[in-house]
From Swiss-Prot:
The encoding gene: gtf2f1
Any one annotated GO CC term: transcription factor TFIIF complex
Low complexity biased stretches: 84-128, 469-492
Listed GO MF terms: DNA binding; RNA polymerase II general transcription initiation factor activity; TFIIF-class transcription factor complex binding
Subunit (UniProt): Heterodimer of an alpha and a beta subunit.
Region feature Disordered, mapped onto this chain: 82-128, 226-499
Protein name (Swiss-Prot/TrEMBL): General transcription factor IIF subunit 1
InterPro entries on file: TFIIF-alpha, TFIIF_interaction
Sequence ranges of Basic and acidic residues compositional bias: 245-275, 415-427, 450-461
Keywords noted in UniProt: DNA-binding, Nucleus, Transcription, Transcription regulation
Compartments it resides in: Nucleus
Keyword DNA-binding: yes
Amino acid sequence: MSESTNNPNEKTYKINLVKGTKKWNIAKFSNKIDLSSFSKPVRMYKFNPIANMINNESNNFGQPTTSTYTNNHYSYKNIQPTMTSAPNGTNSTGTTPNTTTTTTTTTTTTTTTTTAAGTPGAPNPAAATQPFVRKKRYEAKPVNPKTIPWKLEDSEGNNTYQGNVEGNQASSNYFLFMFQSDGSIKAVPCNDWYNFRPKKEFQSLTTEEAEDFMKKKNQEWDVFTSRLQKKTDPSGSGSGGSESSGKKSIEELEEAEHRNRNEDPNRYKTTNEEKKKKKAPARRREREDEGNGEDGDAPDFESKFDDDDDDTYMDGDGLTGEDENQIEEDEEEEDVDLTEGGLEMKKMIKKQQQQNDSEDDLADDDDKKDNNGGTGGGDDEDDDEDDEDPDQDDLSNLPKVFGKSNADGTTNSSVKKEDDGGKDSKSSKKSKKKDKDSSPKSKEKKSKKNKSDSSVDNRESKKIKKEPSSPQAVQPNSPSQQQQQQQQNIDPNDPPFTEEYIKIVLQKSKKVKSLDLINIFKGPLKNPDNKPIFLAMVHNVARVVEENGVKYLIPK
């Protein structure tokens, strides 16, 4: 031992590395043990793979072998018969004694074949008695002896441990430090490190022993649970008596119910309610059987489904009173979800539809009067011409809408550029048509067409009731509408009732509620005729956006 010159509080020790031929191994036990408590002699051994290989080879040849382990080294006693050839053709067997070192005896077998004079090349009968040996086509994989666990046990078998090698020893080194009397350290390199853990041995039991063992376990568990119940019971009397009394009371109640049922004289009679319950499923079965008779599998052409097309091809309105009531109920349900502005818009659309219906009715009445007061006449050729031309004439009489084509296939701009001669030709056509319309047959056909058109309009109006957000497109910039606006905007305080002003309001505010926009144009909207115009202008300029459950109008 020598003190360090750098720091007086530190001590330095000299380490002397021992270089020798001895190999030291370290055994580490997982728990504290006392080797003196082991019953002697103590035995430590491991499985020998080499001996197993030799046993397998010897078994193939029918040769027994034994192996023993002494002084941490392997030694084998191989009992192998040696075959020596005798001069008279007979074989004799013998054994070689074991020596202190591992010895391996080699055996040589010779067979003599004798041939008779009359049978050259005859087989030897002794060769048939020898066992057939199959040649090995592969070799066993080499086994690392370090990976084979050690087994440590005493003579009585009370202490048994199994030791496995520690980790990957190819990348680690172990040293044993031994302090010497002169203050130096002797470092001894260690070969292997083994961790020893106690080996658990499971006791095998028969079926009867296992049943007895489980009964004892159940009894112990019952005792344990009863003690816990006594501790948890506040009265301290224990829960066993209460449980037994509860079980007895339940059993008594069940017995009383059985007695009442058995003693009841009407137990086999059925009541009216039970009869009704039994008859109900029988009636259902009868109805199902009747429905599945001759026409039970026939398709139902009258039933309607959600994905069916509209009844536009049917004569008349195509809707019954029940259908109209159902539509009204649906409208009432939709009204609950609409805001105040939406309800006002819906009312305006309904008024416009009613006006259109009233105008159609007046036109029908006029046609009837003309039919009653008109004179007979007209040829079949005129009727045929009337059937061919009405579509074109109707299209030519439609109001001029921007971007739409006329019956001739020309746009409004092209119509304006036509010569006066074209206008004169159109006027002559109209005069001819009036002459044809004066005949009673043509009037009857027109009345029928007007009725069919009114029925289609009614259907469309009922569809519009379901979809209030899609009003009829009315162009506000027509000359008649502009004249109405000029007449209505007499009050100087009211804002101009134009599409441009609505666009300016939307651009300034960016998003407006429908009620706020209606309040701005409150004066012009007092006139009911302005409401559909206002709807059309808003539809052309703005679109609806929903934010956080609130609907706003924003410019397009």
